[in-house]
Amino acid sequence: MGMLEARELLCERDERTLFSGLSFTLNAGEWVQITGSNGAGKTTLLRLLTGLSRPDAGEVLWQGQPLHQVRDSYHQNLLWIGHQPGIKTRLTALENLHFYHRDGDTAQCLEALAQAGLAGFEDIPVNQLSAGQQRRVALARLWLTRATLWILDEPFTAIDVNGVDRLTQRMAQHTEQGGIVILTTHQPLNVAESKIRRISLTQTRAA
């Protein structure tokens, strides 16, 4: 039994099948990239795995239990960062981290922002930051979270090369410590091929 399992997932949108019969099992320490063309259902699959959406058929299990039966404990173990940063634009970068990680002290939050490349921007309201900087505020949570499972939709959007390298190193560290990372990205991952598992979506199935 793996930590996260997709079992015979079917997803249809506008009378079109995005994928069907999609099954896979993820174990501790896995780093997974969901690939496929635009419209293949990558974001849809991520939302199914978070429990934000339900499949038309099949189920997602966490540690052998259907998500709807273990929703609270699952979400305690999940960090989800979608296309939208999901941050409070009227708050500062530092206030955002305090909001999401109430048990994190100020020093930890400042260090997380520094790791994300936001040193010097801690006290600026997020609505005054660039799109890339706003994305970094959300991604700074990677240095604070205790969640086992990270699901990240295009985390490198609007991030420069150095930022991508830092984020990639943080993901590698998380998986080396037994965590799971699932992401979509159009950018090449600068890591050994042996470290990445790819699940490729076609119109009707996963390869």
Curated annotation (Swiss-Prot):
One GO cellular component term noted in the UniProt record for this chain: ATP-binding cassette (ABC) transporter complex
Chain ranges passing through the membrane: none
EC numbers, comma separated: 7.6.2.5
Keyword Nucleotide-binding carried by entry: yes
GO function term, MF aspect, one: ATP binding
Protein species of origin: Escherichia coli (strain K12)
Top EC class for this record: translocase
Entry binding sites for ATP: 36-43
Domain ABC transporter per the UniProt entry, residue ranges: 4-207
Cited SMART domains: AAA
Name the UniProt record assigns to this protein: Cytochrome c biogenesis ATP-binding export protein CcmA
NCBIfam families named in the record: ccmA, PRK13538.1
Role, per record: Part of the ABC transporter complex CcmAB involved in the biogenesis of c-type cytochromes; once thought to export heme, this seems not to be the case, but its exact role is uncertain. Responsible for energy coupling to the transport system.
Annotated membrane topology: Peripheral membrane protein
PROSITE patterns in UniProt: ABC_TRANSPORTER_1, ABC_TRANSPORTER_2, CCMA
UniProt record, GO biological process: cytochrome c biosynthetic process; cytochrome complex assembly; heme import across plasma membrane
Subunit and partners: The complex is composed of two ATP-binding proteins (CcmA) and two transmembrane proteins (CcmB).
Keywords: ATP-binding, Cell inner membrane, Cell membrane, Cytochrome c-type biogenesis, Membrane, Nucleotide-binding, Translocase, Transport
Superkingdom in the source lineage: Bacteria
Record field: catalytic activity: heme b(in) + ATP + H2O = heme b(out) + ADP + phosphate + H(+)
Compartments where located: Cell inner membrane
Family note: Belongs to the ABC transporter superfamily. CcmA exporter (TC 3.A.1.107) family.
